[in-house]
Curated annotation (Swiss-Prot):
<dbReference type="InterPro" id="IPR036322">
    <property type="entry name" value="WD40_repeat_dom_sf"/>
</dbReference>
<feature type="region of interest" description="Disordered">
    <location>
        <begin position="141"/>
        <end position="160"/>
    </location>
</feature>
<feature type="compositionally biased region" description="Polar residues">
    <location>
        <begin position="141"/>
        <end position="155"/>
    </location>
</feature>
<keyword id="KW-0677">Repeat</keyword>
<feature type="repeat" description="WD 3">
    <location>
        <begin position="321"/>
        <end position="362"/>
    </location>
</feature>
<feature type="repeat" description="WD 7">
    <location>
        <begin position="504"/>
        <end position="535"/>
    </location>
</feature>
<feature type="region of interest" description="Disordered">
    <location>
        <begin position="1"/>
        <end position="108"/>
    </location>
</feature>
<dbReference type="Pfam" id="PF00400">
    <property type="entry name" value="WD40"/>
</dbReference>
<dbReference type="InterPro" id="IPR001680">
    <property type="entry name" value="WD40_rpt"/>
</dbReference>
<dbReference type="InterPro" id="IPR053053">
    <property type="entry name" value="WD_repeat_protein"/>
</dbReference>
<feature type="repeat" description="WD 5">
    <location>
        <begin position="415"/>
        <end position="454"/>
    </location>
</feature>
<feature type="repeat" description="WD 4">
    <location>
        <begin position="365"/>
        <end position="411"/>
    </location>
</feature>
<feature type="repeat" description="WD 1">
    <location>
        <begin position="235"/>
        <end position="277"/>
    </location>
</feature>
<feature type="repeat" description="WD 2">
    <location>
        <begin position="281"/>
        <end position="320"/>
    </location>
</feature>
<dbReference type="InterPro" id="IPR015943">
    <property type="entry name" value="WD40/YVTN_repeat-like_dom_sf"/>
</dbReference>
<feature type="repeat" description="WD 6">
    <location>
        <begin position="460"/>
        <end position="501"/>
    </location>
</feature>
<protein>
    <recommendedName>
        <fullName>WD repeat-containing protein 25</fullName>
    </recommendedName>
</protein>
Length: 535
């Protein structure tokens, strides 16, 4: 194997050198396969280029017609009297420059430069200061690093041309195997911090999205049926249980998603489709996550029995509580935003006050699990959907509660043998919807005695035991629901006829939600872990 370092023997200039040989074109080739002019060579600290070497042709004055190699002038040696023992020693300092690559070297990534057009606050308010000489003069280490990086990139390109794959360390290969989707773009997102650790601060832009701004001061128009996919958001490594737009209209470009991969994420689902932040505050699956009414905090609960109120920008926990059951549903009180209801794998629903961090009231029934909660009458009443579906379960499938006294208002609402995994309130009519495992949406009155409509039934989708969600459009004209086969179905509220069917996902579509401001934007999530924004 030829040596990668070219030694110049001062005793004999005519003997063959295995690491460097002269060709007829006047160039010297080293063992690495790179060529340079004959007037260039390594020195102890510098590199010299001769004028003759730069203009060398086929008939060189340093070569005789007998093809015998004549002694070359040692123009590249800084110490002409050095002996071989001195040349074998380590050089006193690194060379300042090396052979230039085929293209100009890129600027060093370690050198921080301000973006174009960026003016610091001090420069905008005070007189311009004369920059220091140390700032203007590049350091010797930085120039050495840039030249070395450029030479390394040239060597990598040469090896690529020779079909030699560069070596990848084992640590990087293991990281690539663990993160196959880390290919960049909006589909692959960087992993979040470990569980219990606050993520990096999230800077929420104070300006309103240019797509939302024209609709803020106007009345909501008629909802139109979406036609195509605007963004396909990938980043979760588990099923996405629910999604929700930010309730503050000027910040409604943000979308919240809760997943079984122990995280919940905030996306910019209107402008760019990128993940803004990942929150890993739970040690088990996150079953429910809700925006606070102010749009600055997120309430989350999961299978680790934990409840967290996380600040959106700092990532810290404003409130933390420990439930005695696995949490499946959370709802803020519509009037008192410091109080929320929590239900899950328990026969009791609990009301928490975040100011004291304690449970203030309990609502107990003969059930095993609460599937969903829906507030009525501006928070004075609420409905709970349970998992009771036996023959004598007419008093336990959907229960109406008085929020203040914890008394049951009605327990004879739904009389069929199907559970209802989700509930949705109509924005303008005094009615609510119940998603049933009978593969249809049932319509009920939202005032006592909560009668079910026998004339209108929205069917055509499949539930099959999934927690398939449903929702009404902001104008109330359309209903949307997911399906266990991945479809997204929209119905006319008045006629109960199907308005549109979208082939949304390859696995079960769990969550569907209309944008509160944009009339034709719809978000859907699936058991496969992906989210789609339709327009």
């Amino acid at each position: 194997m030829a040596s990668l370092v070219a030694y110049d023997d001062s005793d004999s200039e005519t003997e063959a050198d295995p690491a460097r040989s002269g060709d007829a074109a006047g160039q010297i080739s080293d063992a690495s396969g790179m060529s340079r002019p004959s007037g260039m060579g390594f020195a102890s600290s510098t590199v010299g280029v001769t004028k003759e070497g730069a203009q060398h042709t086929g008939n060189s004055p340093n070569e005789d017609p007998g093809m015998q190699r004549l002694p070359l002038a040692r123009l590249w040696r800084s110490d002409p009297g050095s002996c071989p023992s001195q040349r074998l020693q380590w050089p006193s300092k690194e060379p300042d420059t090396t052979f230039p690559p085929s293209e100009p070297p890129r600027p060093s990534l370690w050198m921080s430069r301000a973006p174009v057009g960026h003016v610091p606050l001090a420069a905008a308010c005070l007189k311009p200061l004369k920059p220091a000489w140390d700032v203007l003069k590049p350091s010797h280490d930085q120039s050495t690093f840039e030249s070395t990086a450029g030479n390394a990139s040239s060597s990598q390109r040469k090896r690529g041309e020779d079909c030699v794959l560069p070596y990848i360390p084992k640590r990087l290969r293991q990281l690539q195997a663990l993160n196959p989707e880390a290919g960049g773009g909006k589909d692959g997102e960087p992993p979040g911090p470990p569980a219990g650790c606050a993520p990096a601060p999230l800077c929420v832009a104070p300006t309103v999205s240019e797509f939302i701004q024209p609709y803020l001061n106007s009345q909501y128009r008629e909802t139109t049926v979406p036609k195509k996919v605007l963004f396909h958001l990938r980043g979760h490594r588990g099923p996405v249980n629910s999604i929700q737009w930010c309730p503050v209209f000027c910040k409604s470009h943000m979308l919240l998603s809760a997943s079984m991969d122990k995280t919940f994420k905030v996306w910019n689902a209107v402008d760019s489709g990128h993940c803004l932040q990942t929150y890993s505050v739970h040690s088990e699956a996150v079953r429910a996550a809700r925006w606070s009414p102010c749009g600055r905090r997120i309430l989350s609960g999961g299978f680790d029995f934990a409840l967290h109120l996380t600040d959106l920008e700092t990532g810290t926990q404003v409130f933390s509580g420990q439930s005695d059951f696995r949490v499946t549903t959370l709802k803020f009180h519509p009037k008192d935003h410091n109080v929320f209801l929590c239900g899950g794998f328990s026969s009791e629903i609990k009301a928490w006050d975040m100011r004291t961090g304690k449970v203030v009231k309990g609502y107990k029934a003969t059930i095993q699990q609460t599937l969903d909660i829906l507030f009525l009458q501006e928070g004075s009443e609420f409905l709970s959907s349970t998992d009771a579906s036996t023959r004598d379960s007419a008093d336990r499938t959907i229960i109406a509660w008085d929020f203040r006294t914890a008394a049951k208002i009605s327990n004879q609402i739904f009389h069929e043998r199907y559970t209802c995994p989700s509930l949705a309130l109509h924005p303008r009519e005094p009615v609510f919807l119940a998603q049933t495992n009978g593969n249809y949406l049932a319509l009920f009155s939202s005032v006592w005695p909560y009668r079910m409509s026998r004339r209108r039934r929205y069917e055509g989708h499949k539930v099959e035991g999934y927690a398939v969600g449903c929702e009404c459009s902001p104008c109330g004209d359309l209903l949307v629901t997911g399906s266990a086969d991945g479809r997204v179905l929209m119905f006319s509220f008045r006629t109960a006829s199907r308005a549109c069917t979208l082939q949304g996902h390859t696995q079960a579509c769990l969550g569907t939600t209309y944008h509160p401001v944009l009339p034709s934007v719809l978000g859907t999530c699936s058991w496969g872990g992906d989210i789609k924004i339709w327009h």
